[in-house]
UniProtKB/Swiss-Prot annotation:
Cofactor binding note of this UniProt entry: Binds 2 magnesium ions per subunit.
Family: Belongs to the UPP synthase family.
SUPFAM superfamilies: Undecaprenyl diphosphate synthase
Name of the molecule in the record: Ditrans,polycis-undecaprenyl-diphosphate synthase ((2E,6E)-farnesyl-diphosphate specific)
Active-site residues (renumbered): D26, N74
EC identifiers of the protein: 2.5.1.31
An annotated Gene Ontology molecular function: magnesium ion binding
């Protein structure tokens, strides 16, 4: 086996409660430009990297992997690049559905899919439905997503429930507010990884990462490999998660 998926590593991941990893996959365009290529080729290489990282997550018994594929702000990019990204998204869904089932992966999409074309929306629904009963890794894809959008959407759902007398306004607490977000059925995010050198969150899972550990690397996403992923996991192992409390040492 090429990857570091030893029993010791799996046990450490379980012991440290590393269950949900979220990745901001940044640097595809710059990777291509550095090589004198069009940005679209960088996204294609980024897809290849994503496949490898998903495999590594499966082999190491990570429960949930969230990938930031397309933000709501990404619509500001050139039209040709957006078209290429949508085509790549459709290709990825169509080409990987067999592997998702083979490796017992459940696909979940979060974000506003309404602007996507009908073929893409239908295929998203198809793949989510066909993998729904898979019990291994939950592959959570954030597409046309933003943290602010998620929070506002959650607030609107709460208002509707209050208006319908389903929920009393005094019952609204942090623990049940999370139930109104797109990640309601998922475990909290333990580790956020951002590639590409930037040190910001970029409107990603703003509510869900309140107590997440943050790992930033200068490595561009297409160059990010399983060893780099393991370095991020090893960094997580060094952290003492206090969740607002004090050190127990």
């Amino acid at each position: 086996m090429l990857y570091k998926s030893s029993l010791k590593n799996k046990k450490r991941i379980q012991k440290e409660n590393l269950r949900h990893i979220a990745i901001i996959m940044d640097g595809n365009g710059r990777w291509a430009e550095k090589r004198g290529k069009i940005r679209t080729l960088g996204h294609k290489e980024g897809f290849k990297t994503a496949r490898k990282i998903i495999k590594y997550a499966v082999e190491n018994n990570i429960k949930i992997l969230t990938l930031y594929v397309f933000s709501r702000e990404n619509w500001r990019r050139p039209k040709l690049e957006i078209t290429a990204l949508m085509k790549l998204f459709f290709f990825a869904l169509k080409s990987e559905i067999k592997n998702l089932n083979k490796y017992n992966i459940r696909l979940k999409i979060i974000g506003d899919t309404s602007p996507f074309n009908e073929n893409l929306k239908n295929y998203i629904h198809k793949v989510e439905k066909q993998t729904f009963n898979n019990t291994g890794l939950i592959l959570n894809i954030a597409a046309n997503y933003s943290g602010r959008w998620d929070i506002i959407r959650g607030i609107k759902k709460i208002i509707k429930d209050v208006q319908k007398d389903v929920l009393d306004i005094d019952q609204i607490q942090e623990r049940n507010f999370s139930q109104y977000l797109s990640t309601s059925e998922l475990l909290p995010v333990d580790l956020v990884i951002r590639t590409g050198g930037e040190k910001r969150i970029s409107n990603f899972l703003l509510w869900q990462i309140a107590y997440s550990e943050l790992y930033f690397t200068d490595i561009l996403w297409p160059d990010f490999n399983w060893r780099d992923f393991q370095h991020a996991i090893d960094y997580f192992f060094t952290r003492e998660r206090r969740f607002g409390g004090i050190s127990i040492s």
